Amino acid sequence: MSIEIEAELQTAVDKRRNFAIISHPDAGKTTLTEKLLLYGGAIQEAGAVKAKRAQRHATSDWMAMEQQRGISITSTVLQFDYQNCQINLLDTPGHQDFSEDTYRTLAAADNAVMLEDSAKGLEPQTRKLFEVCKMRKLPIFTFINKMDRPGREPLELLDEIEQELGLKTYPVNWPIGMGDRFKGVFDRRKEQIHLFERSIHGRKAAVNTVVNLGDPQIEKLLDQDLYYQLKEDLELLDELGSALDLEQIHTGEMTPVFFGSAMTNFGVQLFLDAFLEYALKPGIHKSTVGEVSPTYPNFTGFVFKLQANMDPKHRDRVAFIRVCTGKFEKDMTVSHARTGKTVRLSRPQKLFAQDRASIENAYPGDIIGLNNPGVFAIGDTIYNGKKIEYEGIPCFSPEIFAYLRNPNPSKFKQFRKGVNELREEGAVQIMYSADEAKRDPILAAVGQLQLEVVQFRMQNEYGVETRVEMLPFTVARWVDGGWEILQKVGRLFNTVAVKDSWGRPVLLFKNQWNCQQVESEHPELKLNNTAPVVSGQEPESL
């Protein structure tokens, strides 16, 4: 590798940061996302999630159903520049039914931001997603939100993180007051107090007063009890708290903690500044040939998301690619690891929710959008030079199953197109009866809302009204050994065998007990709760 190419790649890597935000529903994730964009200069005014008509819709919530309901139901990518760095912000669905989409997004992230509601602390969805971050050893930054509302004591919230998640905590800033008396935060990095003023609905960047802790005017700016409480808290943190350890942050053992209020912009810019300093740059990825450095000269990347109809006018399909190594260039020809085919990557795009702009090149850590003519599947690797294939992204085990019926035969073409495209992007898993005569697709979802989203999008994007018929199953297991082993076992009690989109056998059980009973009676059956990663095989279409 030439010194010039290595230097170009290293410079690009040093300037890049990316992260995904994880949280429980209603912790304020979309609001925080908007405010980070506001401070990053990517938008001029933030839009409330549950917007009045006069207000803007949140930038990241671009799908029609998201704007109607005020919830995020698909991951979006938001890219902006801040302080000479390029930040890729991967906004994820907060609703628990879409945890699979979040899981796929975390595969493309180098860092995670864990968002907590100060009144609620750790919540079930946050814990679940934390486990995924822990498994991937992602650095985790914690933002404790809604400090301008009544909430739990900061020390109690830190203790909960340490005891329940096993993380060391380091508060980078510390709140001054809570609820109506929340005045701002103390920045421990620079030993400065930031006193904030509310902006109208938090739509503009907050104006704040910055003073040193020893400044005589502090006692005039703060109520006496808040001032003495702050000094007492800081002494306690210095005496009993952990010291900041960048290595432990990068290995996911320590979480830097920030306090603030995304709605009123308190503490958002301080978080962004510290994130740039502490976050992990794009790093190595595990592959079939071992660990690959981002400065490896040949381009490689993987597909972590597919999205149909980002621009409903053009009925397009976009593949979201995480660039892992080398330099991506427009119109380059690459190899597709799963099929062995060569693909020309034309019309690459920089993404910003549903908005896109053409790009000429991209570097490790970047997320780019490529037109998908039906070639790509989630988890696919594309590469130049020597074959490299990254670890695939497994499917979650669904818990809700239903036939999707098309009551209007004249709409079959649109119905088929919608089902195939929504399957490709992972909006829902699609299964089929093992009986070839029954061709109605079976929707396999993590939660009820996923089924509603499929029906809404079939109507809104494909013009097809559908009917859902629920099935009495709650557990799915993939069968090792394929159909041959199932035929040897014969009929199973209270169980139905279906095939997934790749033609592999999946057993559906009415409940967990039913599943355990079959495993106990048939030890020769090896059952998995995640789908095996496929290679060199095309999925079945309707």
From Swiss-Prot:
Cross-referenced Pfam families: EF-G_D2, GTP_EFTU, RF3_C
Subcellular location per the Swiss-Prot or TrEMBL entry: Cytoplasm
From the UniProt annotation, give the residues forming the signal peptide: none
Q: Which GO terms describe its biological process?
A: regulation of translational termination
Gene3D superfamilies for the chain: P-loop containing nucleotide triphosphate hydrolases, Peptide chain release factor 3, domain III, Translation factors
Instruction: Please give one Gene Ontology molecular function term for this protein.
Output: translation release factor activity, codon specific
Arranged from A to Z, the UniProt key words for this protein are: Cytoplasm, GTP-binding, Nucleotide-binding, Protein biosynthesis
Gene Ontology cellular component annotations, sorted alphabetically = cytosol
What InterPro entries does the annotation carry?
EF-G-like_DII, EFG_III/V, G_TR_CS, P-loop_NTPase, PrfC, RF3_C, RF3_dom_3_sf, RF3_GTP-bd
Q: Where does GTP bind?
A: 23-30, 91-95, 145-148
Give start and end of each tr-type G domain: 14-283
What HAMAP family would the database entry show?
Answer: Rel_fac_3
Family membership, please give it.
Belongs to the TRAFAC class translation factor GTPase superfamily. Classic translation factor GTPase family. PrfC subfamily.
PANTHER family (UniProt xref): PEPTIDE CHAIN RELEASE FACTOR RF3 (PTHR43556:SF2)
Question: What is the recorded function of this protein according to its Swiss-Prot or TrEMBL entry?
Answer: Increases the formation of ribosomal termination complexes and stimulates activities of RF-1 and RF-2. It binds guanine nucleotides and has strong preference for UGA stop codons. It may interact directly with the ribosome. The stimulation of RF-1 and RF-2 is significantly reduced by GTP and GDP, but not by GMP.
Descriptive protein name: Peptide chain release factor 3
As recorded in Swiss-Prot or TrEMBL, the protein's gene is named prfC
